[in-house]
């Protein structure tokens, strides 16, 4: 099990980024959540199989076509025991 926090910077709000992350996390079988931050970034928590978590982080690095990702800062964190994945 791997658990990470990802902070995504760039043009990532108002472009469907969170919903695209939710779909990709579901496809990968990753648990956690994603939300907008007041400073314009998006924060996500991913928990699950290490390869699946890496896939979710990789998706954030590219994002949907409507987004322009400038950077993704990833930090290893303690698991929250999330069940499923949701947009906050």
Task: Locate each region found by the language model.
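Intrinsically disordered, low-complexity, mixed-charge
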Residues: 1-88
């Amino acid at each position: 099990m791997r658990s990470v926090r990802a902070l995504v910077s760039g043009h990532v709000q108002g472009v469907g980024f969170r919903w695209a992350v939710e779909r990709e996390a579901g496809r990968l079988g990753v648990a956690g959540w994603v939300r907008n931050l007041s400073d314009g970034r998006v924060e996500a928590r991913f928990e699950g199989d290490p390869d699946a978590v890496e896939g979710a982080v990789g998706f954030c690095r590219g994002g949907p076509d409507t987004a322009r990702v400038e950077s993704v800062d990833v930090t290893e964190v303690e698991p929250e025991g999330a069940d499923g994945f949701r947009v906050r």
